[in-house]
Amino acid sequence: MSIITGKTKLLGIIGHPVEHSLSPVMQNAEIKRLGVDYIYIPFPVKPENLETALDGFATIGVMGFNATIPHKQAIIPLLSEVTTTAKLVGAVNTVWRTEIGWKGTNTDVIGFVTPLKALNRDWNTIKPIILGNGGAARAVVVGLAELGCRDICVVGRDKDKLGQFKQSWDTSELQASITVHSWDELSGMVSESQLIVNTTPIGMFPHTQNSPVDSNLWEKLPNNAIAYDLIYNPSPTQFLKDAKQQGLTVIDGLDMLVYQGAAALEIWLQQPVSATVMSEALKQSLFS
């Protein structure tokens, strides 16, 4: 894409606010490399205008779009079709046009699991710990279940919200795989875990010195354990710095951001894309 014409196909992201989104940077970088006549645009859409926006997108021929806060749950009843993955997560982040209307899925799941698959572990034997019980934790639970994990521990600080999180899976096939635990239990659990995932915002810019766990926690984990932080700014976080200092394998939130975006672009374009190009564009935007 170099010049926008009457034939240029529209992609984008809806949110409120959406001005801070990094998706246009990485998506347009790969669109340019591929030489396809598309452009990816941020669309600020207030919650009360969501249905109107979808009608407008259909009218002007938008081919597909990402949905971010606060639309990832609210958009579901407005879609003609939703994938099983998105239903399990309870949120949609990627939407595309079909013959019967809009179809939605959640590429956060594939974004999360792709870096883990590259490690070639026996996931059936791994007992992961998830820090936090918000929306991001739901995608992580679904991803871990897809990998084959059958004993998924979710740790949170608010007892009521933890209970609600657990209850929200009661009608799901994953219900038996999930246990919830208070933060006080964490220290006694980590010696049996080979994967710890931070889904909380603790350590996010500008509070870069913070970590959701004490630095001495890492010495209790097995030597082959993996630390995964969904935060991508800073890169690495204090959480990952402490884990790496202990010699553990670390995965940055930038990987998840890139792979979920690449998965969405492949759905829209129906062709393979380069996650490397998207990653480099993001790093340049964030850190140069």
UniProtKB/Swiss-Prot annotation:
Pathway entry = Metabolic intermediate biosynthesis; chorismate biosynthesis; chorismate from D-erythrose 4-phosphate and phosphoenolpyruvate: step 4/7
Quaternary structure and interacting proteins, as annotated: Homodimer.
Pfam families cross-referenced by the UniProt entry: SDH_C, Shikimate_dh_N
Q: What does this protein do?
A: Involved in the biosynthesis of the chorismate, which leads to the biosynthesis of aromatic amino acids. Catalyzes the reversible NADPH linked reduction of 3-dehydroshikimate (DHSA) to yield shikimate (SA).
* InterPro entries given in the database record: Aminoacid_DH-like_N_sf, NAD(P)-bd_dom_sf, SDH_C, Shikimate_DH, Shikimate_DH-bd_N, Shikimate_DH_fam
Which CDD domains does the record associate with it? NAD_bind_Shikimate_DH (cd01065)
Residues noted as binding NADP(+) in the record, renumbered to the chain: 132-136, 230, 253
Q: What is the lineage of its organism?
A: Bacteria, Bacillati, Cyanobacteriota, Cyanophyceae, Oscillatoriophycideae
Please give the coiled-coil regions recorded for this protein: none
In the record, the note on similarity to other proteins reads: Belongs to the shikimate dehydrogenase family.
MF terms in GO: NADP binding; shikimate 3-dehydrogenase (NADP+) activity
Keyword line: Amino-acid biosynthesis, Aromatic amino acid biosynthesis, NADP, Oxidoreductase
Q: Where does shikimate bind?
A: 21-23, 68, 93, 108, 232
Give the protein name, as stated in the record: Shikimate dehydrogenase (NADP(+))
Q: Which GO terms describe its biological process?
A: amino acid biosynthetic process; aromatic amino acid family biosynthetic process; chorismate biosynthetic process; shikimate metabolic process
One GO cellular component from the entry?
cytosol
Active site feature: 72 (proton acceptor)
Q: Which reaction does it catalyse?
A: shikimate + NADP(+) = 3-dehydroshikimate + NADPH + H(+)
Q: For this protein, what is the EC number? A: 1.1.1.25
